[in-house]
Amino acid sequence: MTNQLMALNQVSVRNRLMPLTALVQQGEQIHIIGPNGSGKSTLLACMAGILPYSGAIDLQQKCLSQYSHCQLARYRAWLSQQISSVPIMPVFQYLQLHLAAHLVNCDGVLSELCSFFKLGKFLETPVGNLSGGEWQRVRLTGVFLQVWPSINLEGKLLLLDEPTNNLDITQVAALDLLIKKFCELGGTVVMSGHDLNHSYDKADRIWLLADGSLVANGKPDEVMKENTLSRVFAADIKCVPEKTDKYWRVFLP
């Protein structure tokens, strides 16, 4: 992980995000953690080029604002927490929206991704008929399909806002495997979440946000300190070691 993919320099959004500076390296899995309202979604939307911001964001040494929306769609995929859809649109048609018109020989990758998330029987189902977990798996399949390296050589970055929402434990495990594979192929993932144990176990680097400010940035062991987490989340958070592993628990009065 020696190649810089993205650089953020004093990025801010009025009343939502304080000036923030950070680097994203190719192949990294970065988790953004922090309380509700700390700026996680705002930061991801800025990095996706969706939300106006002050400061500078460079993607592959080029200012993010210099990319057209079509160019950005080739380089990065963004999963927001909520998205409206056309209820009668079948799943297979929704997934096709994530593919560039010039791409060919995508069937193998589509089949592999659908198998990961067990979507085969839903391909002809209208998205409006899906459960919350099924819809989340469809959306995840779409963003992976958009930047999967074997069919999109320009695909580099996945920005995922709370991607584990509505997923059960086996689906989270499948997502983790797919993220790991994407990073091994040279992709980079920046995602937000609320599961401290999951982030401690899976992240290469953690950005800890509080009140719109980046209060810590580093490896999980460097960032996830009991006093720091307790202060940020305004709760008594303890590390509970079990053999060689660590588990984070919140103790409420």
From Swiss-Prot:
Coiled-coil stretches are: none
* Catalysed reaction equations from the record: an R-cob(III)alamin(out) + ATP + H2O = an R-cob(III)alamin(in) + ADP + phosphate + H(+)
Query: Residue ranges of the ABC transporter domain?
Result: 1-236
Q: Which GO terms describe its molecular function?
A: ABC-type vitamin B12 transporter activity; ATP binding; ATP hydrolysis activity
Q: Name one GO cellular component term.
A: plasma membrane
Q: What is its EC number?
A: 7.6.2.8
List, alphabetically, the SMART domains matched.
Answer: AAA
Entry binding sites for ATP: G34, P35, N36, G37, S38, G39, K40, S41
Concerning InterPro entries, the annotation shows: AAA+_ATPase (IPR003593), ABC_transporter-like_ATP-bd (IPR003439), ABC_transptr_BtuD (IPR023693), Metal_Ion_Import_ABC (IPR050153), P-loop_NTPase (IPR027417)
Cellular localization per UniProt:
Cell inner membrane
Q: Which domain of life is it from?
A: Bacteria
Predominant location: membrane
In the UniProt record, the signal sequence range is none
* Record bears the keyword Transport: yes
User: Which keywords has UniProt assigned to this entry?
Assistant: ATP-binding, Cell inner membrane, Cell membrane, Membrane, Nucleotide-binding, Translocase, Transport
The topology of this chain with respect to the membrane is: Peripheral membrane protein
Family, according to the entry, reads as follows: Belongs to the ABC transporter superfamily. Vitamin B12 importer (TC 3.A.1.13.1) family.
How is the subunit organization of this protein annotated in UniProt?
The complex is composed of two ATP-binding proteins (BtuD), two transmembrane proteins (BtuC) and a solute-binding protein (BtuF).
Q: What does this protein do?
A: Part of the ABC transporter complex BtuCDF involved in vitamin B12 import. Responsible for energy coupling to the transport system.
The protein depicted here goes by the name: Vitamin B12 import ATP-binding protein BtuD
